[in-house]
From Swiss-Prot:
Signal peptide: 1-25
Gene Ontology biological-process entries: entry receptor-mediated virion attachment to host cell; fusion of virus membrane with host plasma membrane; symbiont entry into host cell; symbiont-mediated induction of syncytium formation
Protein name: Fusion glycoprotein F0
Glycosylated position list: 27, 70, 116, 120, 126, 500
Stretches for region Fusion peptide: 137-157
Transmembrane segments: 525-550
Length: 574
């Protein structure tokens, strides 16, 4: 009767989980703002990493001194093969230890020699492998930045004299103990695998018998299973240069991880959050190779501490907003650059511009505050009024109207420009909407895909409520003649200031042009006046001359008596 009960309990648990997931997804809402071509997805709860919790994990190893068995039994051969793999793994870990950042000169001088086997050309091989791993580790370390700093600090302490023995002694009679290190830090240490006791007390006594006989295959299988964990841990550390993320089930099994979470100095709500989201915890955790010494392999597991939980979070999606003039090359564009995740945090807002660094599970958002910027709560005003005077909203500008789509939590924003064809489709009904030029939005209700040109986008099928907030596109408020282009990291006030500068320059140019034209007009008037005066003077002179001439012609000629007698005399003298 227990089996049906277990089935019923399992079904009940599954239904409860589905109900919880469905209920939480129902709380997701999304608002699209036509005026700024942006959408805000709300209803999420925070899980912000604010610190790290470090723990030391150990595996006890065996000092295999001698293998007397030379039998031909198939099971014995399998055991010997596993022992060879075991030896190679330990050698690999020894070499890897020399290139980890926690290793110092003292630790290198004390490199353990308790294994009676070597690699071919040990000296040259060690140097070559060590140099290669150093280069690889440095490259990996640049990628994780300061995230593993606390784990490295603990790992370095383990290289000091007596630290490994201190841990080993604490774990003699238990698999878990709190150990105070020499730097004053207390860490929880756990022994997850005891290969020493198994190999020394169970395996080697069998294979070293003169008869070299193994009665059953179970012994081989058991050793393979135990050895496989060490081999996988070695492979992961080797491939990832001593630092791995996420933390695999070989580094920590699920039961070991849950036990470790339960021992963490955090609230019950935080423990519940981490226990219910083990995969996310693994993704945000690190395992760091530390030391192999005194027949002990020790590595550090660094788990996230979620110091801020259950505060509201929202995600901003943005897409280019352009004018839609028919003349090609005459359009201007504006895009909000403040897209990403936002979470309330102690009276301010933690902003995560790289949204992909946050992990979402149902309505829970797991983010690392190391990747965040702290902003005032007024940043929310940008969603409802981008021109608000309390917070200077961030934008970028261009004069290239590229068509694209942004998939949101509950739909898609579509920026469609030029001759690009943009559609929304249902897998059963085909195209159900064709977008006109401009910025638009479609919810995921009845929509499976969005097509922009030759690019196909699949919308999320999360449940929730969408709201379309209409408004005049703010790009229409700007004059293309004075709109600044290619401003990649600007704000509304900076763009407006550049526009005002352009307008002031135009006004100044107009004034200068007006002054030049006015000067030219004055000169023209003076020249015209002079010409007119000269013409008037010339005309006056001509008029006076004509008047005198006419007067002279109209006066009769009178001859005196003497002149007449002279004439007569002359006439008669001939």
């Amino acid at each position: 009767m227990e089996l049906p009960i277990l089935k019923t309990n399992a079904i009940t648990a599954i239904l409860a989980a589905v109900t919880l997931c469905f209920a939480s997804s129902q709380n997701i809402t999304e608002e699209f703002y036509q005026s700024t071509c942006s959408a805000v997805s709300k209803g999420y709860l925070s899980a912000l990493r604010t610190g790290w919790y470090t723990s030391v994990i150990t595996i006890e190893l065996s000092n295999i001194k001698e293998n007397k068995c030379n039998g031909t039994d198939a099971k014995v051969k399998l055991i010997k093969q596993e022992l060879d793999k075991y030896k190679s793994a330990v050698t690999e870990l020894q070499l890897l230890m020399q290139s980890t950042p926690a290793t110092n000169n003292r630790a290198r001088r004390e490199l353990p020699r308790f294994m009676n086997y070597t690699l071919n050309n040990t000296k040259n091989t060690n140097v070559t492998l060590s140099k290669k791993r150093k280069r690889r580790f440095l490259g990996f370390l640049l990628g994780v930045g300061s995230a593993i700093a606390s784990g490295i600090a603990v790992s370095k302490v383990l290289h000091l004299e007596g630290e490994v023995n201190k841990i080993k002694s604490a774990l003699l009679s238990t698999n878990k103990a709190v150990v105070s290190l020499s730097n004053g830090v207390s860490v929880l240490t756990s022994k997850v695998l005891d290969l020493k006791n198994y190999i020394d007390k169970q395996l080697l006594p069998i294979v070293n018998k003169q008869s070299c006989s193994i009665s059953n295959i179970e012994t081989v299988i058991e050793f393979q299973q135990k050895n496989n964990r060490l081999l996988e841990i070695t492979r992961e550390f080797s491939v990832n240069a001593g630092v791995t993320t996420p933390v695999s089930t070989y580094m920590l099994t699920n039961s070991e991880l849950l036990s470790l979470i339960n021992d963490m100095p955090i609230t019950n709500d935080q423990k519940k959050l981490m226990s219910n989201n083990v995969q996310i915890v693994r993704q945000q955790s690190y395992s760091i190779m530390s030391i192999i010494k005194e027949e002990v392999l020790a590595y550090v597991v660094q788990l996230p501490l979620y110091g801020v939980i259950d505060t509201p979070c929202w995600k901003l999606h943005t897409s280019p907003l352009c004018t839609t003039n028919t003349k090609e090359g005459s359009n201007i564009c504006l895009t909000r650059t403040d897209r990403g995740w936002y979470c309330d945090n102690a009276g301010s807002v933690s902003f995560f511009p790289l949204a992909e660094t946050c992990k979402v599970q149902s309505n829970r958002v797991f983010c690392d505050t190391m990747n965040s910027l702290t902003l005032p709560s007024e940043v929310n005003l940008c969603n409802i009024d981008i021109f608000n005077p309390k917070y200077d909203c961030k934008i970028m500008t261009s004069k290239t109207d590229v068509s694209s789509s942004v998939i949101t939590s509950l739909g898609a924003i579509v920026s469609c420009y030029g001759k690009t064809k943009c559609t929304a489709s249902n897998k059963d009904r085909g195209i159900i909407k064709t977008f006109s030029n401009g910025c638009d939005y479609v919810s995921n209700k009845g929509v499976d895909t969005v097509s922009v040109g030759n690019t196909l986008y699949y919308v999320n099928k999360q449940e929730g409520k969408s709201l379309y907030v209409k408004g005049e596109p703010i790009i229409n408020f700007y004059d293309p003649l004075v709109f600044p282009s290619d401003e990649f990291d600007a704000s509304i006030s900076q763009v407006n200031e550049k526009i005002n500068q352009s307008l002031a320059f135009i006004r100044k140019s107009d004034e200068l042009l007006h002054n030049v034209n006015a000067g030219k007009s004055t000169t023209n008037i003076m020249i015209t006046t002079i010409i007119i005066v000269i013409i008037v003077i010339l005309l006056s002179l001509i008029a006076v001359g004509l008047l005198l001439y006419c007067k002279a012609r109209s006066t009769p000629v009178t001859l005196s008596k003497d002149q007449l007698s002279g004439i007569n005399n002359i006439a008669f003298s001939n």
